[in-house]
């Protein structure tokens, strides 16, 4: 329920979880919000 495009694992699924509103553990096996790009 937010306009933030979080990515699951940032490399496992990488899909917008707009319909959920929170990062789920669908791909990596654990919830992981997308951190700020700091030289990634």
UniProtKB/Swiss-Prot annotation:
Main localization category: secreted
UniProtKB keywords: Disulfide bond, Hypotensive agent, Secreted, Toxin, Vasoactive, Vasodilator
Gene Ontology molecular function, alphabetical: hormone activity; toxin activity
Expression sites (tissue/organ): Expressed by the venom gland.
Biased composition (Basic residues): 31-40
Disulfide bonds listed in the record: 12-28
Signal peptide positions on this chain: none
Propeptide: 1-8
Ranges where the record places region Disordered: 1-40
A cellular-component GO term for this protein: extracellular region
GO biological process, one term: regulation of blood pressure
Cell location: Secreted
Function: Snake venom natriuretic peptide that targets both NPR1 and NPR2. Exhibits hypotensive and vasodepressor activities.
Similarity-based family: Belongs to the natriuretic peptide family.
Protein name as catalogued: Natriuretic peptide HsNP-b
Organism annotation: Hoplocephalus stephensii (Stephens's banded snake)
